[in-house]
Structure formats: C-alpha cells, structure tokens
Swiss-Prot record:
Residues 11-219 form the CYTH domain. This is Uncharacterized protein MT2285. Transmembrane segments: none annotated. InterPro entries: CHAD_dom, CHAD_dom_sf, CYTH-like_dom_sf, CYTH_domain. PANTHER family: CHAD DOMAIN-CONTAINING PROTEIN, SLR1444 PROTEIN. Residues 228-506 form the CHAD domain. It comes from Mycobacterium tuberculosis (strain CDC 1551 / Oshkosh).
Length: 513
C-alpha cells in the first residue's frame, strides 16, 4: 500500500428504503408544494458484485463495497454509515484489473479488513425504474426508484463448517427514495413528506439497511446472525465502545480530516488507561504487550498531533496581535513550519496504520472486548472502582506541591504533567463505572494541566525558533512576546489547580457515600 494513497471523492447519500409487494402501485407526488415536476428516467439494468472478508467484517460495520456495471454511476462504490438515513459514498472507476479492489477504497477500510482477503460475497441484479423530482428553480430534489431485485449469496456466507451447496437465489421488490444533497446538506423535512407518500401507497420501512444486508440475512443495518453482544461489564463495555471509536478515527486520519490524528491519539490513550486500571478484569499483566503497543501507537500519532496543535495555537495568537507587533518571518517559522511537521508526522502515522503490527494490535483489542471478564480461581474479578485511580492523583498532587516548593521549573512541570496523566486515567475509569461527577471534575484538571503542558511545549519551541531566527539575522521581538503570553497562561493554570483538586476530592467523597 503506498504511503500517499489517493483520496477518493466523497458524496453524502441521504435515502430511505421501503419494502413493497408485487402488486403495490407506485406513489404519486402531486400536491407536494416543493415538487413542481416529475420526470421519468430511462429504465436501467444494474449488476453489482459485493465484496467483503470471509467473516463479513465490512457488513458488520454497516459498510458496503461493490463493483457495479450498468447505469450512470458504473464503477466501484464504498458506502460508510454517516447517521440516520445517511451514508458517505466514495467511488472509483472501473478498470482492467477486474475484481481487484481499488487501493484507494481498500485503504479507507483497512483497519477493518486488515490483511484478510476481500472477495465476492454476493451478486445483485436490479431492474430499476426511476423518477426525478424537480423543484421550482429547476433543480433536482430527489430520486424515486422502483427496483426489482434478484440476488445470489456466495458460498463465503455459509457458517464455519457448513456445507456449500452453491449460491441461493433471492428475489424481491423495493423502493428507494434518495434526496439530492447540496454542499453536504439535505432537506430532511422534504424527505419525511415524500416518504409519507410511499407509506400511504402501501410501502413499509425496509427491514434491512441495504440490499446486501438482506442477502446476507441481516435483520437491521449492520446486524448479522450470531453477531457479538455488547459486554455487560461497564469497563469492558467502555473499552468496546472506544475500540469502535478507534476504527472511526482511523478512517478520518486516512482522509486527513481536521483534528483526526489528535482524536485518534486521545482514543488510543483512553483504551490504554482503561486497560491499565482494569488489568485483573481483562487478565492482563503490568507489562502486557497490548498496553505497550497502545503506548507506541500514541507516540507515533503524537508527532502530527503536536504539530497540528502548535500550528493552530500560533495562528490564533499571531492573528490576535496588532500588525505592528508581528515582526520578521515569525509566521513562516511558527505556522508554516508546524504545517510541514504535521505532514511529516501524518506520513509516519499512515505508515504505522498500514502495518502488520497495527493489524495485530487491532486483533488483540477485538479479542479482549469479545471475551468475558476474566475470572480468577473460579471467582469473578473484583469490580473496578475509582479508589486506586484517585489515590494516584492525590499522590501525584502531593509530589507536585513538594516539587513546586523545592525544585526548579522543569521538575515542577514534570510533576504537574504527571497529575494530568493520572487525572485522565481517573476520568476514564470514573466515566466507565458511572461516577459522572468525578469524571467531570477529573476532566477539568486534565484540561487545565493539558493547557499548561501545551504551554511548556510551546515555550520550548519558541526558544528554539527564536535562536534560529536570531542566527539568521531576523527580528525576534514577537517570539519573546508569545513566550511571555505562554508563561502567563501557565501561571494562571497553576493558580487554578488547587481549587480544582478540592472539587475533585469533594466529588470523590460524594461518590463513595
């Protein structure tokens, strides 16, 4: 997989599907104020081959990947969930490679398929009659499709060990109602009005989220027979939810979405914190490989994250200064330089996200969340509580107070950073175990000291850039101005810490009552 995989264009699809019987008459859209004209489109014959892993990992994540011929949009289509009635569609053209999935589409879902084979799992043939609904301005508003569907499931769908008796043919009729979106927005009220006409005509909301889901036997979007159930244990459930978020942010990072690297790193650290504070429950040891791998992944993502945060920070601070206070090449060095470092960090991150090492980490996380809470000596593990995590926060706070009284700035900053890391672990554990007030107060401390740590990193970077600017004979006035602003911010954060710690203590004592 190339480091710089091309990014396919994205299109927001807003549609609803309806089940109808053979005798149901197509609806009329007369009387709907927004619709001034309905135009019949030529009949289409669409043939699509759907691809997935042998265990249907894409379908379980409500994702479809197909190669379609016929119609105006022949090509490869990848559809991702984007909310109720919405999916993000990405396309690639047909090529001479036949059934080889385009690399740019496969890369989008690489965290789901990993190094498994992606192969045909179904073929769907659709005879489509469609109508385009136009508004007063002459623009298309929506498309109504009357589909007669014939489908065949591939032998890969059969359960492990089951005999393969060949593909089974299925036939049904369905309606689709798709809005024409503009700049990623859609008139959902219009969709409701149009959908009511279909219901009045005798249609029923589809019992499947896609044609493929019906072929594979799903009863609702993303649900396949014998799919995993959410863990009952709250900490296991929290880890499971964060692993799902990790896969979502993985796709956002590959698309270079704003703040995606930062959020993926946050999610990685959440998982690591929850596992570290619940090792007995998960059957892990202190030096567990999965915890070490999560730390390493966060470190790799941190290069791009730090550059993105610093670049945004300097952009805001420089924009807030009077023009006469911004001297020399400070914007080029601080903002443009951060953007270059971000691109370097992003390339490193993408290399990591396409590696076997990353795939094995994801496999290990899947195994952890799918297993029952680890039991010791035939008994259930002790429930995870906030007590141990809070004791670590108090210990770090005491050490920081000592460092503030006796040590220099560096040791003080390190001690405050330790409070932040431990408050973060407490926050995640408290949220997972239902101690919401504790989680909120821990978040306040995490945010406060996060701002402090960003100030520490920023001041170190400002010194380095000021030295380079001075060596080049440039004006360094603005670097000193920004440095003092950062120092003032750090001082304000330290002044607010004691009160925040008291509020946390109060929340913990209340949670214990």
């Amino acid at each position: 997989m190339p480091v710089e995989a091309p990014r396919p264009a994205r299109h927001l699809e807003v549609e609803r599907k309806f089940d109808v019987i053979e005798s149901t008459v197509s609806p009329s859209f007369e009387g709907i104020a927004a619709v001034v004209r309905v135009e019949q489109s030529p009949t289409q014959q669409l043939d699509a081959v759907y691809f997935d892993t042998p265990s249907h990992d894409l379908a379980r994540n409500q994702i479809t990947l197909r190669r379609r011929t016929g119609g105006a949009d022949a090509g490869w289509h990848l559809k991702l969930p984007a909310g109720p009635d919405k999916r993000t569609e990405m396309r690639a053209p047909l090529s001479a490679s036949g059934d080889a999935v385009p690399a740019e589409l496969l890369d989008v879902v690489l965290a789901i398929v990993r190094d498994q084979p992606v192969q045909p799992v179904a073929r769907i043939s659709t005879h489509r009659e469609s109508q385009i609904l136009y508004g007063a301005g002459g623009d298309a508003l929506a498309e109504f499709c009357n589909d007669d569907v014939t489908a065949w499931s591939a032998g890969a769908f059969h359960a492990a060990g089951a005999a393969d008796n060949g593909p089974a043919e299925q036939q049904w009729r369905e309606w689709e109602l798709e809005l024409v979106t503009t700049d990623g927005t859609a008139d959902t009220k219009l969709l409701d009005r149009l959908a009511n006409r279909l219901l009045d005509a005798g249609a029923a909301p589809a019992g499947h989220g896609s044609k493929l889901a019906r072929v594979l036997g799903a009863t609702s979007p993303g649900e396949l027979p014998n799919g995993p159930q959410p863990p009952a244990d709250p900490v296991h459930r929290a880890v499971s939810e964060q692993v799902e978020q990790l896969l979502l942010w993985d796709r956002a990072v590959r698309a270079d979405a704003y703040d995606a690297v930062h959020q993926m790193r946050v999610t990685t650290r959440k998982i690591r914190s929850l596992l570290t504070d619940s090792q007995e429950s998960f059957g892990l040891k202190e030096s567990a490989w999965v915890i070490d791998e999560l730390r390493e992944l966060a470190n790799v993502l941190g290069v791009a994250r730090d550059a993105e945060v610093l670049g945004d920070r300097y952009q805001r601070e420089l924009d807030a200064l009077a023009p006469e206070l911004v001297r020399g090449r400070v914007r080029e060095r601080l903002v443009d330089g951060a953007r270059r470092r971000y691109q370097t960090g992003l390339r490193r991150s993408l290399i990591a996200l396409r590696s076997q090492r990353y795939f094995r980490l994801l496999d290990a996380l899947d195994a952890l969340v799918s297993e029952r809470a680890h039991a010791t000596s035939g008994e259930e593990s002790a429930p995870v509580t906030i007590d141990a995590a809070y004791r670590r926060v108090r210990k770090a706070a005491k050490a920081a107070k000592t460092a503030g009284d006796q040590a220099g700035d560096h040791h003080r900053d390190e001690a405050l950073h330790l409070i932040r890391k431990r408050a973060k672990r407490l926050r995640y554990t408290a949220a997972a175990t239902g101690a919401d007030n504790v989680s909120q107060e821990a978040k306040v401390i995490q945010t406060l000291l996060g701002d402090h740590q960003d100030s520490v990193v920023s001041r170190e970077h400002l010194i380095q850039q000021a030295i380079a600017a001075n060596t080049a004979g440039e004006d360094t006035f603005t670097y000193g101005l920004l440095y003092q602003q950062e120092a003032d911010l750090a001082e304000r954060c330290r002044e607010q810490l004691e009160a925040a710690l008291r509020k946390l203590d109060k929340a913990v004592r209340k949670a214990r009552d």
